[in-house]
Structures are given as structure tokens and as C-alpha cells.
Amino acid sequence: MRLLGLDVGSKTVGVAESDPLGWTAQAVEIIPIDEEAEVFGLERVAELVKSRQVAGFVLGLPKNMNNTEGPRVEAARHYGELLEERFGLPIDYQDERLTTVQAHRMLVEEADVSRRKQKKVIDELAATLILQNYLDCHGKLCAKL
């Protein structure tokens, strides 16, 4: 069994998965979505749930730096509700403050990736960081693995 880590944006969802033991997170893919058209990519998530034996979801919670919750937190929670309704699997949330900044820094400073290429992988990397932080903190869903 694995956990899927999701970095939910308004146009894409970055996806990462844990290894079966819950020690490491690896990038999987980016799923295109369109919040305005209410297209959430759940068909692709369903394929991943089935093929990867998913036990639960960890969604990034993009809180503000002062710990308040803005509209993106509401959107992430709504996506979590959609997942729970569709799949009946447990959902947990991980504070994702600065994960995108950390991902950018990793891509630019450590990997010297061009801006054009960054756009293609930034959401996957952010999802990986969200899930790895969750696994490192032994979140409640880790017991499901």
C-alpha cells in the first residue's frame, strides 16, 4: 500500500507516491485540471489509486506565512472532499508553506534547470516535498502502510 501526495493548484495537481514502507516519496506526474470548469482529473487519480494500491491521500495545505488560511486552502480542502467522496480513502493535510520556494531553489541552485523546464516539473517536486515531509513527521496515515 502507498500514499499519494498531492500539490493542488488551479490548473494542475502534482502527484507523488510513497514507497510501500512509507519511507520515501517519489514524483509521479502532473495531472492537468481546470477548477473553473470543474474538471478535477479524478479519472486519472482513479487509475493511479487502482494501479498503485493507494491507502490514502496527503494534500498540501498552502497556509499563509502568518498561519491564516486563504482561498487556496479552501480549494485544497474542497479537492480533499472530492477525493474522499469518490474513493472513500482517508485524507490528511500537510502544511506546504515554502515547498514551492524550496522546489524552485532545488531546481535552480542545485540542478541548474531552465525556467521553461521548471514549469514542467515544479508541481511534481512540490508534491514530493509535501509527501516526504509528511512521512518524516509520521503523519497519521503512515500507520495504513
Swiss-Prot record:
User: Where does the UniProt entry say this protein principally localizes?
Assistant: cytoplasm
Arranged from A to Z, the UniProt key words for this protein are: Cytoplasm, Hydrolase, Nuclease, Ribosome biogenesis
The GO cellular component terms are: cytosol
Pfam families, per database record: RuvX
Where found? Cytoplasm
Highest taxon in the source lineage = Bacteria
Family annotation (InterPro entries): RNaseH-like_sf (IPR012337), YqgF (IPR005227), YqgF/RNaseH-like_dom (IPR006641), YqgF/RNaseH-like_dom_sf (IPR037027)
Which CDD domains does UniProt cross-reference here?
YqgF
Q: What EC number(s) is this enzyme filed under?
A: 3.1.-.-
Is-annotated flag, keyword Nuclease? yes
Q: Indicate the enzyme's highest-level EC class.
A: hydrolase
According to its UniProt entry, one GO biological process term is: rRNA 5'-end processing
GO MF annotations, alphabetized? nuclease activity
Transmembrane portions of the chain? none
Recorded family membership = Belongs to the YqgF nuclease family.
Function, as annotated, reads: Could be a nuclease involved in processing of the 5'-end of pre-16S rRNA.
Entry-linked PANTHER family: POLYNUCLEOTIDYL TRANSFERASE, RIBONUCLEASE H-LIKE SUPERFAMILY PROTEIN
What's the protein name? Putative pre-16S rRNA nuclease
